[in-house]
Amino acid sequence: MTTTQIKNRGFTLVELLIVIVIIAILTVVSLVAYNGLQNQAKTSTAKSTADSVAKKAELYNTEKGHYPEGLTIFTSNTDDSTTPPSDNKKNSWYMSGESVKSATLTDGSVPADGPLAIEYVKCPGSSTSPTGAQIYYYDFSSNKKVARVVGTGC
C-alpha cells in the first residue's frame, strides 16, 4: 500500500508579492480617478457660482440700466447710493458673502477660496455705466481661468 502524504502548503513569497503589487496598482488608479472627479466637482461648483453672479449682474442691469462696477455690490446688499435696504426688502441682486468670494485669478494658481473665488471685470464704457462684464471662474481640471461674458462691450 502506498500512502500519499498531503502537505499543507502556504502561499509562496512570489505569490504574495504579486498580490501586493496588484493591490498597489489598483490603489493608484483609484486615487487618480478620485482626484479627477474631485476637480470636476470643484469646476462645476465654480461654474455654477459664476452663472449665479452673471444672473445677478443681469438683474442689476435690468433694475439700474447698467452693470455693476464690481463684485462687492452683490455681497454688500447696497445700491449705487450705498444705502442698505431694510432687512425685509433685500435687493434682488444680493448674494451672501459666504456664497461668492472676490479674487484675482491666474492660470496655474489654485485660488485660496476654492470654487467660490470669482473675478469680476467690468467692460469698457462710461465710468459710471459699464455696458457689460467678464466673470471669471477657475477650471480645476485644466488649471486655467475661464471667462463668462454678460452684456456688451467686452
Where are these regions (language model features)?
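Acidic, glycine-rich loop-and-strand cores that form catalytic or ligand-binding grooves
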Residues: 70-113
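Short amphipathic beta-strand and strand-loop transition segments with alternating hydrophobic
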Residues: 110-127
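Membrane-proximal amphipathic alpha-helices
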Residues: 38-50
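N-terminal leader/signal peptides at the extreme start of proteins
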Residues: 1-11
